């Protein structure tokens, strides 16, 4: 089954769910439904706050995982890598030694998202510290860190369909 471009984010979901999202997108009610379910954006606005937020989640759920050297918002992420967040191991030469550093980059798209959506993408990237592949163990770890992970992932994918179809910024800060 080939999906319309805005619905490509829902490719692995059952047809009845995709049809519901498509209908809501067509009648213009999808944005309002998401805004009703997730009324407010999060308060994490800069790289320092994002680093602290990710560090707190990591300390709570993954104490023994390797430390993160960098956590930043990335404006090019979705266009360049076709990803919403990435976790990278970067090799740096320090003196005569090679040091591996771990970084997490979150797409700027999530700056104006609800806290639940930010938590979902951060949990996803943190899970990659322990599990490299998107397999059963990976998703079990995601669900251990965020029990509502699967619903949040679906809602994020639904939001991405809306953004791609309309360009709507549901939680953009209001200007005075």
Give the location of each predicted region.
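Active-site-proximal or metal-binding-adjacent scaffold patches in catalytic folds
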Residues: 1-119, 129-176
């Amino acid at each position: 089954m080939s999906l319309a471009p805005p619905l490509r984010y829902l490719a692995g979901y059952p047809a009845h769910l995709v049809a519901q999202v498509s209908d809501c997108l067509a009648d213009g009610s999808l944005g309002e439904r998401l805004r009703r379910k997730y009324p407010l954006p999060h308060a994490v606005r800069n790289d320092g706050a994002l680093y602290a937020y990710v560090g707190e989640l990591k300390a709570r759920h993954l104490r023994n995982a390797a430390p993160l050297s960098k956590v930043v918002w990335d404006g090019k992420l979705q266009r360049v890598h076709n990803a919403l967040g990435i976790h990278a191991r970067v090799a740096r030469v320090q003196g005569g030694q090679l040091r591996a550093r771990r970084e997490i980059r979150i797409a700027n798209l999530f700056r104006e998202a609800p806290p639940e959506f930010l938590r979902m993408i951060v949990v996803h990237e943190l899970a990659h510290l322990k599990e490299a592949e998107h397999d059963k163990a990976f998703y079990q770890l995601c669900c251990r860190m965020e029990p509502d992970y699967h619903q949040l992932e679906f809602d994020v994918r639904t939001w991405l369909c809306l953004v791609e179809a309309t360009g709507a910024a549901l939680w953009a800060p209001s200007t005075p």
